[in-house]
């Protein structure tokens, strides 16, 4: 059970890190598409 919790925390952290890293790129791409 502890392994599942640790895996879930690691997955959430990795997804949050990739989201915060890709968010500026996605926002700039959306701005360029709407322009």
Curated annotation (Swiss-Prot):
Post-translational modification remark: Unglycosylated because produced in viral factories instead of the classic ER -Golgi route.
* Listed GO biological process terms: symbiont entry into host cell
- Nucleus as a keyword? no
Q: Give induction info.
A: Expressed in the intermediate phase of the viral replicative cycle.
Q: Which sequence ranges are marked TM in the entry? A: 2-22
**What protein family does this chain belong to?**
Belongs to the orthopoxvirus OPG076 family.
Q: What is this protein called?
A: Entry-fusion complex protein OPG076
């Amino acid at each position: 059970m502890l392994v599942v919790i640790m895996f879930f925390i690691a997955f959430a952290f990795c997804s949050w890190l990739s989201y915060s890293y890709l968010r500026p790129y996605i926002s700039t791409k959306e701005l360029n598409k709407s322009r």
